[in-house]
Amino acid sequence: MNVRNFSIIAHVDHGKSTLADRILERLGAMGERDKRDQTLDTLELERERGITIKSTPIRLTYRRANGEEYTFNLIDTPGHVDFGYEVSRSLAACEGVLLLVDASQGVEAQTIVNAYLAIDNNLEIIPVVNKIDLPAADPEGAAQELEEVIGIPAEEAVFASGKTGQGVDQILEAIVERIPPPPGDPQAPLKALIFDSFYDAYQGVILFVRVLEGTLKPKQKIMLFSNGKSFEVDKVGTFSPGLVVGDALSAGAVGWVAASIKDIHDAQVGDTITEKDRPTAEPFPGFKPAQPVVFSGLYPTDTEDYRKLREALEKLKLNDAAFTFEPETSEALGFGFRCGFLGLLHAEIVQERLEREFDLDLIATAPAVVYRVTLTNGEVFETQNPAEFPTRDRIARVEEPYIKLSIMLPEEYVGPVMQLLQERRGNMVTMNYVGKRVELIYEVPFAEILYDFHDRLKSISRGYASMDYEQIGYREGDLRKVDILVNGEVVDALAVIVHEDKAYSLGRKIVDKMAEVIPRQLFPVPVQAAIGGKIIARATVKAYRKDVLAKCYGGDITRKKKLLEKQKKGRARMKQIGTVEVPQEAFLAVLSTEE
């Protein structure tokens, strides 16, 4: 069977989508009219940021010099650390991968992680050194690094350039020769892996599948393993980019299925499809519902939009298996949703897609991780919302998630980066030298890298450092909840959970920032940061002042005192009943103090 299923994996920005464009062009899948960059990046946002978020598959035909025809299924994958689960599912649908390395930058943190993912899935790896047309390129050096770090022999590497198209023919030949054809018996009971899905207004949920065994065809009754629900297949087909209707998908094929599935939650990515009357013995292993690790509240600026936001989140969840949300209310912001994401980039993209595609105006609260709290009565519970954090006298201990962080960087930046990691409470595990570069491995509390760690890392290393991380479980920490009070009232949406050592400085920054953005009232407004009952920082928004003495020319001092006293009493009365509106900018200001 002349079929090859493969995927391209690389570190962000190593030219994966551009190389995919050249392969499509060489195989005639792009007419002159379609020639735009990053053909496989379908979301407007992906093209704008130049990153791949959703995995997009495509079917191609390759004719060798001797006239043999091969069908290639290329599954494009995201390269960003947040979308690791998407990558792992796309890889499960392949037999081999092209592992791209930028000739001018060498092996980066994610290259290593992606390579190990491929090795774990027993995939054939074809190393490709890309961007050899760059003046700073050192293809032999990059191939050598691959051998040192991952153990892929340097002589196996194919040198190519996604820009000029050089080396594309060698890559195509390598795919035919090195990647094995897909196994599987078309006569066996049906077994197909869902590696992505999206919602279509007319056909319901459309599943992207890799058929492992058996044959999938219209009118068939299929069943989903994870929940036992069954559906009838309406249409099947392949991708060329865009959905093309076909007759059937047999073992080894990659394609799509429409089966009038109305609810997105029925079709989980990573689930196995089988035939209802003749089910396969066991599902494809490794299915795990994606676990969100970063949480943030999303609130509509206009409370009227609550329903609209809910519908938008439902629709987005359709295409994004890893995103979760549940309703929550805040005294300060009204009704909204607590949303879970795979990471910060994921959170940013979801928010941007909501604002763009559904025309919503949103406020996001500070991102938080999931803390595990043990109370004095022995009860254990998890919370990611600082507003739900219990008071200090009820807490026996608090644990926070830690990550194993690996950073690749040129050796001259090691000092400043280690200092940054020390500030972020990191513990060093090991340090490896790879040529002129260093791999640092640290264990760091996840919360410490949430806000601006990546930006700081990039600026300290002039953009040369790259990072990747994985969760390694919970550890105990001295964490405190800092409450922010405006005019004596606690503003729940502004609470933050922070390590004891940083509580004072963070509280100070927040109150100073808040005092700048809260509009002045007719009475002075204190803004305070508190841990439990203890105030640790305060700033005051000065009052507007009416000049009550304007009418007194010269004259008696007692008269002036009387007027000032009267003004003071009026203010005191106003302060008791006056409420202070905390404006939108104040919430955003808190997020930006996180430096």
Curated annotation (Swiss-Prot):
Positions binding GTP in this chain are D13, H14, G15, K16, S17, T18, N130, K131, I132, D133
Catalysed reaction(s) here are: GTP + H2O = GDP + phosphate + H(+)
What does the record list as GO biological process? positive regulation of translation
Keywords, ordered alphabetically: Cell membrane, GTP-binding, Hydrolase, Membrane, Nucleotide-binding, Protein biosynthesis
Q: Provide the protein's localization.
A: Cell membrane
- Location of the tr-type G domain: 1-183
Q: Does the keyword Transport apply?
A: no
* Top-rank taxon: Bacteria
- Cellular component, GO annotation: plasma membrane
One GO MF term on file is:
translation elongation factor activity
> Could you say which EC number(s) this protein's record lists?
3.6.5.n1
* Stored Pfam families: EFG_C, EFG_III, GTP_EFTU, GTP_EFTU_D2, LepA_C
Q: What class of enzyme is it?
A: hydrolase
Work out whether the entry's keyword set contains Nucleotide-binding: yes
Its membrane topology is listed as: Peripheral membrane protein
Say which family it is in: Belongs to the TRAFAC class translation factor GTPase superfamily. Classic translation factor GTPase family. LepA subfamily.
Say what the protein does: Required for accurate and efficient protein synthesis under certain stress conditions. May act as a fidelity factor of the translation reaction, by catalyzing a one-codon backward translocation of tRNAs on improperly translocated ribosomes. Back-translocation proceeds from a post-translocation (POST) complex to a pre-translocation (PRE) complex, thus giving elongation factor G a second chance to translocate the tRNAs correctly. Binds to ribosomes in a GTP-dependent manner.
Task: Please give the name of this protein.
Answer: Elongation factor 4
- Species of the source: Deinococcus geothermalis (strain DSM 11300 / CIP 105573 / AG-3a)
* Gene for this chain: lepA
